[in-house]
Design a protein with these regions (language model features):
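Eukaryote-biased, non-catalytic alpha-solenoid scaffold regions
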Residues: 1-276
Length: 276
């Protein structure tokens, strides 16, 4: 097919971007930075945008395998680049979009990618495979519950997916992983499930305690916030700065309840963290 030919030409470097680099002194001589301008003289952007449109048509027609093959290639693709004098670093899909060489809704593209991936994979492989995409910054900004509203067909086996997704994320470090874990548990198990996970997973994701307190704060449940704060501070590593944030929220809850002794106790924890 034409798409397959374009993919091969890009992979082999037969289709490439021209570049021109220069030193930008617009912020002053000492704050100059090297700027690379890309020139798409071979219409690569148009070809990739055609693939993106075709893949979405495949999703709408329930041809998920065909869509998935294109999406996988798009996110792994590297377009060669060369200046007049030498080869330059290759360019991925996100850099193409940042430099206006393609014009597409990257968030929707990412959600459709995950949707197609979900549809073609066996149930027990979905969470692990889909997580690999989150190395890309576009995916790192997604909210997974949006996945369930992007395609025409309702996704199946969602209970197993959420269980597998939560089991995978709870073992992973990182801010994105913590956010995804929090959102997944709140969506699937609610605030009590989030608190349960915080208790079990304090060493890997201590920020879950803070998320629980934030949720309780929305309902002005200050006694629960106090209790969470006490439990969190008894379990979280004493060197972590998040302890001061937890203690501060707990102190505020105590002040709302006129629990002066507890408020002073939590405030002392905040001061201790600052002075460490």
């Amino acid at each position: 097919t034409q798409i397959q030919k374009w993919k091969e030409l890009i992979d082999e470097g037969e289709l490439y971007l021209d570049t021109e680099g220069y030193e930008d002194y617009s912020n002053g001589y000492w704050d100059s930075e090297w700027v690379t301008e890309y020139y798409d003289n071979q219409g690569i952007g148009d070809k990739i945008q055609y693939m993106i449109r075709f893949a979405e048509d495949c999703v709408n027609d329930r041809r998920y395998q065909a869509a998935n093959e294109i999406y996988e290639w798009l996110w792994e693709m590297e377009v060669s680049a060369a200046s007049e004098y030498e080869e330059e670093d290759s360019v991925d899909l996100e850099i193409l979009e940042e430099n206006n060489l393609i014009h597409t809704d990257m968030k929707r593209l990412a959600l459709l990618t995950l949707y197609a991936d979900y549809q073609v994979l066996p149930a027990n492989e979905r969470a692990k495979d889909m997580y690999l995409y989150f190395a890309c910054s576009t995916f790192a900004k997604l909210h997974m519950e949006e996945l369930f509203h992007v395609g025409r067909e309702e996704l199946k086996d969602t209970e197993q997916f959420w269980e597998d997704w939560i089991d995978l994320l709870k073992e992973k470090n990182g801010d994105t992983e913590a956010r995804l874990l929090k959102e997944a548990i709140l969506y699937y198990k609610g605030i009590d499930g989030l608190y349960e996970m915080a208790e079990k997973n304090a060493s890997v994701h201590p920020s879950l305690y803070l998320s629980v307190m934030e949720q309780y704060e929305k309902g002005h449940l200050y006694e629960k916030i106090e209790k969470v704060g006490e439990n969190a501070l008894s379990k979280i590593d004493g060197n972590l700065t998040i302890r001061s944030k937890i203690a501060l929220r707990a102190a505020f809850a105590s002040s709302c309840l006129n629990h002066e002794e507890k408020m002073m106790h939590f405030a002392g924890r905040v001061l201790f963290q600052i002075l460490q």
